[in-house]
Design a protein with these regions (language model features):
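Residues lining hydrophobic/aromatic ligand-binding pockets adjacent to catalytic sites
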Residues: 1-119
Length: 119
């Protein structure tokens, strides 16, 4: 299964496959009908405490990776999401995030975690 990352502000493309918003909050300035998301998986987004501890600081990213990965490992909704994605295979899945930083964000961590779980 191919897992892609894309900002919510980038236009949808035909090869995006199944599009999932993975942020806890709805992206500013985007109407629901304009996002073209198949799902909003906010229950597997990082907790408010985890996000605030990271505070978009690249120097704190390693700690954010550890904290968010631990949340995913203990979150039954994350396990259900993995099962759901297995049923979609071989469809491409695009994880949508609103962060301006395309390197240090929760979607990057989630993609790596999902790839490990999906094999």
């Amino acid at each position: 299964m191919d897992i892609k990352l894309k900002r919510t502000y980038d236009p949808p493309e035909t090869d995006d496959g199944y599009r999932v918003l993975v942020d806890h909050l709805w992206p500013r300035g985007i109407k629901k009908e304009n996002l073209h998301a198949d799902e909003w998986a906010k229950s597997i987004a990082p907790s408010t405490e985890c996000r605030k501890a990271f505070n978009h600081d690249p120097e704190r990213f390693e700690n954010f990776v550890s904290a968010y990965t631990a949340e995913l490992d203990s979150n039954p909704d994350a396990a259900t999401f993995v099962t759901q994605l297995k049923q979609l295979a071989p469809t491409t899945v695009t994880l949508l995030f609103s962060d301006k930083d395309t390197v240090y964000n929760n979607a990057v961590i989630l993609k790596k975690w999902l790839q490990a779980k999906l094999g």
